Amino acid sequence: GDPTDLIPKIAKLVGANDVFANEDYESYAIKRDKAVSKQVKLHLYKDTVIMRYDEVANGKGLPYRVFTAYKNTWLAKLESDYRFIGEYKINKKKIKEQESTKKIEISSLKDIGFIESEAKINKIELSVIDEYAEKRDFPALDNTSKASVYLRFGFVSVRSLIRKIMPIDNEGKKIWLSELVWRDFYFSILANFPHAEKNCYRPEFDLIEWSDDK
């Protein structure tokens, strides 16, 4: 269904005055969240990135267009403030328990058509970092961390991964961390230069006429 219709309806159904979610920086998600926020109080929080698109800027306060410069500033900010990857503990004393008198029927995954897959999800393998610098680019070798899909769908926190690798001191760690920085850079580009999602990063190149139409 359409989340702009379903989210407000579900909030009303369960008696929720506010909806809390994590930020998404793709153009579709931004439009979706704006539409939802017009119907229900929507609170969005940074989660999928370490540093938001507006937290890393050049000396003039403008977003970076080149990755290396972005990465250098990103690493310097992390070095000076480890709160970017800090852990947050929930104060359970402030959370009130309230038993709902309204019974809500929620369909199971089986009821809505999902079937159990025989595919096994691989664990995230941080042990590969020791040889990551030398072996990461060889498809025949099983030497990737397998973290990509977990990060993409929010199954694991990018902060927890960085906290785990910070004590490591080798070239593999530097490259793997650089690839996580690239994720933030990618989202920064999406947020600051939304035209790049479907057009050339530099708009003037959209006018190039390709002889083979590709």
Residue ranges and their predicted role:
Residues 68-208:
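Glycine/tryptophan-enriched, flexible segments
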